[in-house]
């Protein structure tokens, strides 16, 4: 075999020997949007910014990711475990604890298998970004100079 025929045989053999999807295996097997693992030497706050950017790419919000990050900085210092002094507000975007069960139900999907806790950074962020995408930042209207 010469030339193009030989090249075709090599390409076909290579594709049959490499399992489908092996080169593009995800870093995580968690379902749903923005299932990002922390990378080496990444702080929690850096990871939260990545999750916010990821969610905003999927559900655009007024002011984009920069505004969302600004609001999260003011609300919690980008700390997923932040709880207000009286315990009324929780997580990255400081959702009202009393409103959290309804917000979780309304703004997540069961197939995503998100953690139900408001103190989960990914879940808290996805709920906030979806709310802001649909309704604007009204729930966070009084937040700083963002």
Where are these regions (language model features)?
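Secretory targeting and sorting signals
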Residues: 1-27
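Catalytic cores of secreted/periplasmic lytic hydrolases that degrade extracellular macromolecules
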Residues: 27-30, 39, 133-146
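Sec-exported extracytoplasmic/periplasmic mature domains
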Residues: 56-60, 73-77, 97-101, 129-137
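Export/targeting segments at the very N-terminus of extracytoplasmic proteins
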Residues: 16-17, 24-78
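Stable alpha-helical elements in mature extracytoplasmic
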Residues: 47-51, 64-68, 121-131, 136
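Surface-exposed patches in mature extracellular/periplasmic domains of secreted proteins
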Residues: 58-69, 80-85, 137-146
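A short, structured beta-strand-centered segment in the mid-to-C-terminal lobe
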Residues: 110-123
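Substrate-binding/active-site groove segments that recognize
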Residues: 86-109
């Amino acid at each position: 075999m010469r030339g193009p025929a030989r090249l075709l045989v090599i390409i076909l053999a290579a594709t049959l020997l490499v399992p489908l999807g092996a080169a593009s295996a995800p870093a995580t097997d968690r379902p749903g949007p923005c299932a990002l693992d922390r990378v080496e030497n990444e702080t929690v706050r850096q990871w939260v910014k990545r999750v916010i950017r990821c969610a905003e790419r999927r559900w655009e919000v007024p002011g984009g990711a920069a505004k969302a990050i600004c609001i999260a900085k003011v609300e919690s210092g980008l700390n997923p475990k932040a709880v207000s002094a009286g315990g009324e507000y929780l997580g990255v975007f400081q959702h009202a604890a009393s409103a959290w069960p309804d917000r979780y139900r309304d703004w997540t999907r069961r197939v995503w298998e998100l953690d139900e806790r408001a103190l989960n950074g990914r879940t808290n962020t996805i709920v906030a970004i979806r709310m802001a995408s649909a309704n604007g930042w009204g729930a966070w209207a009084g937040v700083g100079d963002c």
